[in-house]
């Protein structure tokens, strides 16, 4: 917060004397290596208070993506700094009429595309929980372009599963600011002297080949970069599909022995092992082993 009032703030802080404005100035930059990719790290310092902000960018040319994240640091020695809002970053699109497509839904009806015209003002999508059907994925296209295999698409996603928000603000001149990160809902971050905090990453991308290429890009990026898909994973068996909530020690050991014989390397008891969990209406979140089902407890 600070500078032009027309820009949506990415960092909002309150200092000991209740000053709430930032005056961040460029101080230095460095180019680092993160695996096979380059990371640009730009240091901004406040002109009056001991707050340093690092804007970090990792370029992934193989996927036409840029990852961005922010680190804030209290470099003072005396006073705490209260962070009221800290997003992962933003990007701007030139003045035009744009349509936003994002995903919504509910249990059993996940990832339903929703498309809307972005008019002047702010369109916010957000989540206050951890459900998978609340996706931060977005795709921005010029109004009227709907071809799956051709046309401009600006796209991205926040790499975070907690409470989050994405803002799409169209200004009076038609320019579009896209920003996103942790949603500081009924919360704040207190930085003590010497303490720092790093936001989750947000990724941005662009293609001229429609939303089909967006799907392919994210599939490859998730598999090869986020999940490091080249690593060999163990063969897993999940007993949920055989027993549901009706589990007990003798039964699960018997299934595990059979699973081992066919080459399973990791056996998972998914649900029903904790107290009160006999159906999907109780017990969830009470992670105490039900000794009636597992008298000897559970351990790796």
What residue spans do the PLM features occupy?
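Polysaccharide-binding surfaces and accessory modules of carbohydrate-active proteins
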Residues: 1-169, 185
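Short Pro-Gly-centered flexible turn/kink motifs
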Residues: 8, 12, 17, 21, ...
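Short, hydrophobic/aromatic-enriched beta-strand segments in well-ordered soluble domains
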Residues: 42-46, 55-57, 68, 180, ...
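Terminal connector regions
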Residues: 60, 201-234, 241
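Short loop/turn motifs at secondary-structure junctions
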Residues: 66, 82, 198, 262-263, ...
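Conserved, mostly hydrophobic/aromatic
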Residues: 70, 193-194, 237, 267
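Short acidic, Pro/Gly- and aromatic-enriched capping/linker segments at domain boundaries
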Residues: 175-191
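Aromatic-lined carbohydrate-binding/catalytic grooves of carbohydrate-active enzymes
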Residues: 230-300
């Amino acid at each position: 917060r600070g500078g032009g009032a027309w820009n949506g703030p990415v960092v909002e802080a309150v200092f000991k004397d209740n000053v709430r404005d930032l005056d961040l100035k460029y101080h230095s930059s460095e180019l680092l290596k993160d695996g096979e990719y380059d990371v640009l790290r730009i240091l901004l310092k406040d002109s009056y208070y001991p707050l340093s902000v690092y804007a970090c960018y990792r370029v992934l040319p193989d996927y036409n993506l840029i990852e961005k994240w922010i680190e804030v640091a209290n470099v003072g020695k005396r006073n705490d700094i209260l962070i009221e809002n800290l997003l992962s970053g933003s990007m701007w699109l030139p003045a035009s009429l744009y349509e936003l497509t994002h995903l919504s839904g509910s249990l059993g009806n996940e990832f339903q595309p929703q498309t809307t015209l972005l008019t002047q003002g702010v369109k916010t999508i957000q989540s206050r929980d951890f459900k998978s059907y609340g996706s931060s994925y977005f795709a921005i296209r010029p109004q009227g372009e709907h071809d799956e295999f051709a046309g401009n698409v600006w796209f991205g996603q926040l790499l975070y599963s907690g409470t989050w928000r994405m803002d799409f603000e169209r200004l009076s001149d038609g320019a579009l600011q896209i920003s996103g990160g942790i949603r500081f809902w009924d919360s704040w971050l207190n930085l003590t002297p010497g303490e720092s905090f790093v936001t989750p990453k947000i990724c941005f991308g662009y293609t001229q080949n429609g939303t089909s290429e967006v799907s392919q890009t994210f599939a490859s990026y998730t598999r090869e970069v986020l999940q490091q898909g080249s690593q060999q994973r163990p063969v897993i068996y999940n007993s949920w599909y055989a027993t549901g909530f009706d589990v007990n020690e003798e039964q699960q050991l018997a299934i595990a022995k059979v699973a081992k014989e066919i080459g399973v390397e990791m056996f998972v008891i998914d649900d029903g092992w904790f107290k009160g969990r006999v159906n999907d209406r109780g017990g969830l979140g009470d992670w105490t082993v039900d000794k009636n089902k597992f008298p000897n407890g559970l351990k790796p």
